[in-house]
Amino acid sequence: MDFNLGYLGLHTRDFQASNGYNAADLHFRVNADNPSDTYFYYDASLDFRYGVQGLGELETLREAPAGALRTNDLDFRGSFGAVVRNRSRFLIDLAIGVSAYSALIEETDGIFAVTPKYVYNRGIADITLGAEIALKKSSKDKFQDFELNKAKGQIIYPDVHVNLAIVRNYFNFQAFATGGIERNTYSSLKETNHFFNPYYGLGHSALLDNTVEKYNVGGGFNGNIAGRFLYDVKFGYVRYGNA
């Protein structure tokens, strides 16, 4: 079991205004620790962040509602299933993410994803075969009639990984095909750009839209020659639905 509490404070000043963002973080995780060959596997985590973005000193900001921008970000991730003889896993991965904004804007955005998959690990092979089913839900701001997270994606995405140790430590081969939809939050944008302010185009910012990765395919090989020369070659191609 893992439990953490944290605080994030970002206080900035530029030529237009000074503002501050303060957030409290909570993280909780439980997972299976079973030495048996066959058992029920679980690994689940919960993350929550409550943040308040100050308005700063701009004249237009002084007319905004008290409390500036309040953010609530909740993320749950879990993997559950059966392990058979420590080499086969029949799993279901769950991912639920919700962001609720209040005061300056009133909007809620959420993504739900479920990924059934089979994992095989024996001998030279480590293989994962799965497919992610993802759904998006959001509401428009009732005051300004805009929607932060608009991109819906395609619902079904691949989740396939193949790793083969053809000649262990000398020639290893990897291939993968993945995809998915990711919710971009105000707090993550603020961590990337400390000077970002809610009035710097928040309602029309593509940076806050969902990121839709339609597919990401690639592979590679690595190893060594005679224990003296190391090599690692990778290749891939990714296509985004809203980039």
Where are these regions (language model features)?
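Repeated loop/turn-to-beta-strand initiation elements of outer-membrane beta-barrel proteins
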Residues: 2, 35-43, 85-92, 122-129, ...
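Exposed, low-structure sequence patches enriched in small/polar residues
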Residues: 126, 144-145, 149-243
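Residues that define the transmembrane beta-barrel architecture of outer-membrane proteins
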Residues: 20-26, 68-76, 106-112, 152-158, ...
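Transmembrane beta-strands of outer-membrane beta-barrel pores
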Residues: 5-11, 48-54, 96-104, 120-124, ...
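Extended beta-sheet lipid-handling architectures
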Residues: 3, 94, 111-113, 126-130, ...
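Eukaryotic alpha-helical scaffold "rod" segments
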Residues: 67-111, 116-118
